[in-house]
Amino acid sequence: LLEKVASSDKVSEFAEKINLTSLDKKLDKVSGGELQKGAIAATLLKEADLYFFDEPSSYLDIEQRILIARMISELGEKKTVVVIEHDLAILDYVTDNIHIMYGSPNAYGIVSQKLAVRNAINSYLEGYIQESNVRIRDSQIKFLKHSPRTGWYGEILVKWPKLSKKMGDFKLEAKAGEILRGQVLGVVGGNATGKTTFVKMLAKVLKPDEGEIDTEITVSYKPQYID
């Protein structure tokens, strides 16, 4: 894909710049983040007058989002760019003006007038576009401070010993741990570091090479991708 829009030397140089490490892998062996970076690289490498990026931060971890946002911002200094994005922080960083889209899903959509970035973001959160005197949502979007959870959780629901799993050249190792009943447990980390593999082992979708998860609980699993 990349060599269709640029020379192999330029592709290699650009891949190093965006930490794209899976140039020689088959598509079905590449993570969503790597696929996203590949698509972004193909767009950036092409010589054009107008560049479109449709949700460029999807599937990217925090560090990668910052890197790609910086590259799109640099591109915007000499080219014209249109970005579709859900991440308001990314939009605030890369754009000069914003159109707000609103309407009814699968029924109709309306494109607002062009707004200054800060006005657009505030209007979107408020649910009201003052410049057009239009309410786009019944309620505001508010960010609430998360308070530490207290209460009834404490019983061990799932417990595991040291786990390991090898998949091709990649090896995942996890220390022994547990999940308490009623707990909301987060997993965070860079793309292609094994987050999905770890969760698949806990959900008993994937069998570890080392260690065994001994539990008879019922599991409902939402995968990263739908096959």
Where are these regions (language model features)?
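ABC-family P-loop ATPase nucleotide-binding domains
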Residues: 1-35, 46, 159-162, 166-168, ...
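Walker B catalytic motif
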Residues: 26, 53-56, 63
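Hydrophobic anchor residue at the start of the ABC signature
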Residues: 40, 68
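Conserved signature/switch motifs of ABC ATPase nucleotide-binding domains
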Residues: 46-48, 77
